[in-house]
Curated annotation (Swiss-Prot):
Ranges of the Cytoplasmic topological domain: 118-205
Region (Disordered): 13-88, 176-205
Name used for this protein in its record: Protein TRACHEARY ELEMENT DIFFERENTIATION-RELATED 7
Mutant lacking the gene: phenotype: Constitutive loss of function results in seedling lethality. In conditional loss of function, aberrant secondary cell wall (SCW) formation of root vessel elements; this phenotype is stronger in double mutant plants lacking both TED6 and TED7.
Function of the molecule: Essential protein. Involved in the secondary cell wall (SCW) formation of vessel elements (e.g. protoxylem and metaxylem), thus promoting tracheary element (TE) differentiation.
Topology, Extracellular side: 1-96
Record's bilayer topology term: Single-pass membrane protein
Organs and tissues of expression: Expressed preferentially in differentiating vessel elements in seedlings.
Length: 205
């Protein structure tokens, strides 16, 4: 005949080691009065069960500081202060005046040199003329002498001079350009000077 089995609640045997105490909170910043002493009960606890040891509750709960971060942040140096560069020094007003005067004088000298070079070039291109004068001088002198009787019976010699002058001027003008073509012009001028009668009177006693 089978025996009836009764099940009773099972209790674990008491351990010989005390449980680990809970972490103690950090001391408060201000001093609080100590808690009243805990008095144990007069009757001993049952041998098979021991209550866990709990610390007395604090009269005022204090906030715990946050735990430190497991990964510390690298320390970054502060950025250097922003320094504005000093403004460039303002040039003296006389400096600009000197530059303008020098540039003006240089431009004037350059223009004068350019004008002189252009003048020389045009002078070379201008026609160069050579002038040759040929003068022909022809003079004819005719002398005629006569003796006449004067009013008082004396003899008078009369000399008649006839002078014939021919002046011929021949001007040859040659104009030569810088180009190969040559121009020549010849001008002939004839000047005839004729004085037909020159009378000289000579008296003879």
């Amino acid at each position: 005949m089978a025996a009836s089995v009764e099940y009773f609640p099972y209790y674990s045997p008491p351990s010989h080691q005390h449980p680990l105490p809970s972490p103690v909170p950090p001391p408060p910043s201000h001093i609080s009065p100590p808690p009243p002493p805990f008095s144990p009960p007069h009757h001993p606890p049952p041998p098979h069960f021991s209550p866990p040891h709990q610390p007395p509750p604090s009269p005022y709960p204090h906030p715990h500081p946050p735990p430190p971060s497991p990964y510390p942040h690298p320390h970054q140096p502060p950025p250097p202060p922003h320094v504005l560069p000093p403004p460039p020094p303002t040039p003296a007003p006389g400096h600009h005046v000197i530059i303008v005067v020098v540039i003006s004088l240089g431009s004037l000298f350059f223009l004068a040199f350019l004008a002189a070079a252009l003048f020389c070039y045009l002078k070379k291109r201008r026609k160069s003329s050579t002038k040759a004068e040929i003068i022909e001088f022809d003079e004819h002198l005719k002398v005629q002498e006569t003796i006449v009787q004067g009013p008082h019976g004396e003899q008078t010699r009369v000399v008649m001079l006839e002078e014939d002058i021919h002046l011929v001027e021949d001007i040859h003008k040659t104009e030569k350009l810088s180009r190969p073509s040559h121009l020549s012009s010849t001008g002939r001028h004839a000047i005839d000077i004729s004085d037909p009668n020159h009378h000289f009177t000579e008296q003879k006693s």
